[in-house]
């Protein structure tokens, strides 16, 4: 159990805390140095202990909109760390026959909490108990493919048609979300179906051995950049902010499509470059230490 936590720490914490240092220290100092005044409303202590999602809820519900994206982006990582703090305990201390019941209980509790707060969009989107639904459904699929042979075989031998069906289901739920869930508890329970469709796609992509063009492992570019996704997620607000500052410094107006398009492309390219540098020369040092805490004997 200790090795699991250490491996998690070595992968997540180094970049997470580097972003916090930038967002709460370096960025405000840089703004002050060039004469830009700005008040930071986020509470750094919430971020330090992985409770930033609650800080974000507080700011949104007190109508504080000027939240730097480099500070706000941490909320989902906080929820993941909260989740992974207790999730391994289920499998470490409960008998195997209780695992499925525990996973289903987490999902049920999250759905009930979402229904209780069906009118509060901030709670539905950022509260830990609301988002546990996604992680619980992911855990359910992981349980099924590792503990149930039929589920494992189904996803391993999945056909192109079924792959396509999963994508159609997902995009249909996304595009027709408002129409499909336009009822009292729709906002609360609509997430169940969307999360389920995402879990189907992820599990199929992770498990499939079928030779199908919808097996995204065949897309080498996407596979290559897959290891950089955590870096891209946390660093893209910083790169967007830098690009925005540059456009202001050089008086580049964002009033036409061409300028906006060029700015967007440059921001994306910068994000990929910075993310690769971060992973190759910073994060990888800690990742290489993970072998000392192997969870497989």
Write out the residue ranges for each language-model feature.
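Membrane-interfacial loop-to-helix junctions in multi-pass inner-membrane proteins
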Residues: 1-17, 33-42, 85-86, 154-157, ...
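Alpha-helical transmembrane segments in multi-pass integral membrane proteins
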Residues: 1-3, 25, 29, 55-66, ...
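Structural preference for long, well-ordered alpha-helical segments in enzyme cores
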Residues: 4-8, 18-22, 82-90, 242, ...
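Hydrophobic transmembrane-helix microenvironments that flank and shape a buried ionizable site
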Residues: 5-11, 44, 49-50, 73-79, ...
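Hydrophobic alpha-helical transmembrane segments of multipass membrane transporters and ion channels
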Residues: 10, 14-18, 22, 231-235
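Hydrophobic alpha-helical segments with transmembrane-like composition
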Residues: 12, 56-109, 113, 129-132, ...
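Membrane-interface helix-loop-helix regions
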Residues: 13, 20-77, 110-121, 196-202
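Small-polar-interrupted transmembrane alpha-helices in polytopic inner-membrane proteins
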Residues: 19, 98-116, 163-174
């Amino acid at each position: 159990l200790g090795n699991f936590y250490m491996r998690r720490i070595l992968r997540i914490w180094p970049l997470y805390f580097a972003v916090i240092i930038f967002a709460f220290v370096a960025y405000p100092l840089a703004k002050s140095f060039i004469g830009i005044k700005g008040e930071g409303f986020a509470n750094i202590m919430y971020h330090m202990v992985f409770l930033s999602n609650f800080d974000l809820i507080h700011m949104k519900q007190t109508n504080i909109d000027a939240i730097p994206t480099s500070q706000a982006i941490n909320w989902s990582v906080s929820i993941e760390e909260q989740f992974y703090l207790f999730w391994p305990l289920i499998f470490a201390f409960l008998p195997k026959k209780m695992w499925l019941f525990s996973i289903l209980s987490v999902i049920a509790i999250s759905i009930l909490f979402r229904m209780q707060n069906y009118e509060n969009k901030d709670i539905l989107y950022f509260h830990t108990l609301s988002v546990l639904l996604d992680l619980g459904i992911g855990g359910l699929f992981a349980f099924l493919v590792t503990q149930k042979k039929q589920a494992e075989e189904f996803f391993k031998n999945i056909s192109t048609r079924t792959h396509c069906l999963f994508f159609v289901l997902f995009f249909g739920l996304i595009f027709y979300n408002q129409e499909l869930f336009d009822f009292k508890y729709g906002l609360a329970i609509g997430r169940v179906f969307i999360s389920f469709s995402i879990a189907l796609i992820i599990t199929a992509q992770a498990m499939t051995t079928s030779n199908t063009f919808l097996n995204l492992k065949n897309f080498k570019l996407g596979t290559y950049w897959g290891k950089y996704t955590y870096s891209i997620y946390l660093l893209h607000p910083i790169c967007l902010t830098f690009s925005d500052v540059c456009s202001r410094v050089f008086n580049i107006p964002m009033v036409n499509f061409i300028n906006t398009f060029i700015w967007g492309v440059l921001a994306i390219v910068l994000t990929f470059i910075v993310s690769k540098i971060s992973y190759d020369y910073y994060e990888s040092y800690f990742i290489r230490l993970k072998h000392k805490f192997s969870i497989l004997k």
